[in-house]
Amino acid sequence: MTLRLVFMGTPEFSVPTLRALAGAGHEITAIYTQPPRPAGRRGLELTRSPVHQAAEELDLYVRTPQSLKSEEEQQVFRELEADAAVVVAYGLLLPRAILEGTRLGAFNGHASLLPRWRGAAPIQRAIMAGDRETGMMVMKMDEGLDTGPIAMTEKIAIGPDMTAGELHDVMKLAGAGLMVAAIAALEQGELALTPQPATGVTYAKKIIKEETRVDWSRPAEEVHNHIRGLSPLPGAWCEMPAGDKAERVKLLRSTLSEGSGAPGEVIDEGLAIACGQGAVRLLELQRAGGKPVSAADFQRGSKLGRGTRLT
């Protein structure tokens, strides 16, 4: 026996779960994903989401509503007569009529150990906070922000130099396997739900551009966590001297280093940079419009000497 599912997701993070559920033999009655977005240099092309593209490869029915608030859209959803909805990084709020519009409810794959890091950016926030462990969770959704009871958990270690991009790729695969297991248990009537703890709640606010600049006055560990937590996107950045101008450069990889100096000062030609306490060594950088390069390759073109100040 298999379940009739509605899948709701948008970015690449969601795609492995969609493919895994389809591969497990479940009937995917519809895909909900965000509408195509303008792309290209002039924004004249419309680009379908990664989930939309995967759904078309799987020959699945796709819907791209701007909102799920209208009675008309909610009626369409109910008429799908799905057993359950699976939601992974969809990006739209689900009204009660949608949450209650299937026989068994809506189940969300969330990239944190709830109730820590409820919200939009749990992967980035966990690394930026210096967390050493995170995890994927499947929860049954309610009307709150990631407040529903927990069905399944898989813990994942965060390495000391792991970037958000690397953790994202580990978690999207873990989340796929976890959701398949949860839906199998749901199908058998064996999925147990546990309320979230009332303590330990934190919120993973969406990353905004105003917080992406590196503050070299902070301790080295905080700077390092900031760099790797924002890598590769949107990318932490600083300004470096470029002739008589300043050049904005993204910092994609770093590691903790020894040494001291004024905050932002280059303290050796291997791109160790002094922080408020300690130092970080830059390992990978990216100029505007360029490709990511190693620190050694970057230095061949820039030659940032000792005493140079980054801001």
UniProtKB/Swiss-Prot annotation:
A GO cellular component entry from the record: cytosol
HAMAP family linked: Formyl_trans
Gene Ontology MF: a single term: methionyl-tRNA formyltransferase activity
The name this protein goes by in its record: Methionyl-tRNA formyltransferase
Residues given in the record as (6S)-5,6,7,8-tetrahydrofolate binding sites: 112-115
Family named by the database record: Belongs to the Fmt family.
Pfam assignment, any one: Formyl_trans_N
Role description: Attaches a formyl group to the free amino group of methionyl-tRNA(fMet). The formyl group appears to play a dual role in the initiator identity of N-formylmethionyl-tRNA by promoting its recognition by IF2 and preventing the misappropriation of this tRNA by the elongation apparatus.
Keywords noted in UniProt: Protein biosynthesis, Transferase
Chemical reaction(s) catalysed: L-methionyl-tRNA(fMet) + (6R)-10-formyltetrahydrofolate = N-formyl-L-methionyl-tRNA(fMet) + (6S)-5,6,7,8-tetrahydrofolate + H(+)
Enzyme Commission designation: 2.1.2.9
Gene assigned in the entry: fmt
Enzyme category, top tier: transferase
